[in-house]
Amino acid sequence: MSEIQLRPTVATDLQKLMALEHNTNSESVWQLELKRNTGQVSATFREVRLPRSIQVEYPHNKFALADDWVRKSMMYTAIMNNDQVGYLSLLERGTASVVWITDLVVDASFRRRGVASALLASAQGWAETRQHRRLILEMQSKNLPAIRLAQKFGYEFCGYNDHYYLNQDVALFFSKTLK
């Protein structure tokens, strides 16, 4: 198995990062059910297995990466066999104690090899050295692989936005308290 190397993203990485396969497949989704009663709104998410696997389109414009990366607080690139195989973007928003993971992408041919895990660990290390108290990871409710990864690393569901992405997909937010 090849070693995963992580480093801060540089401008020369961007073309290859934009060319990565950003979409994923999912066999289940987190389905939102809203119930509205007088003086009360109840939101429930339940995992629903689909009759067949669906392709989950990446919710951000991957071609805007060349413009957006300079606005990120930090961006890591994962390298295997001298190729860029994934990336993770971090953004300090609002309060200085919270960092958002806005992008976590691993090329399809390199998934299930520990790349996303290594990127998440680097994000946590970066946030801790900057004395942040919380990481928030965003993902689509259709992206069960990302939901499972968040849960595996101790992230807990902390909210949603039902029209967060341009394609109107539901965004889920998972957070992790740092030491």
Go through each PLM region and give its residues.
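Residues forming the Rossmann-fold NAD(P)(H) cofactor-binding site
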Residues: 117
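Extreme N-terminal starter segment of soluble prokaryotic enzymes
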Residues: 2-5
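Conserved GNAT acetyl-CoA-binding A-motif
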Residues: 127-138
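Conserved catalytic-core motifs of GNAT/GCN5-like acyltransferases
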Residues: 59, 138-139, 154-172
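Active-site acidic-Proline motif in GNAT/NAT acetyltransferases
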Residues: 107-113, 141-142
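Helix-turn-helix
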Residues: 146
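Acetyl-CoA-dependent GNAT
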Residues: 11-12, 19-102, 107-109, 120-122, ...
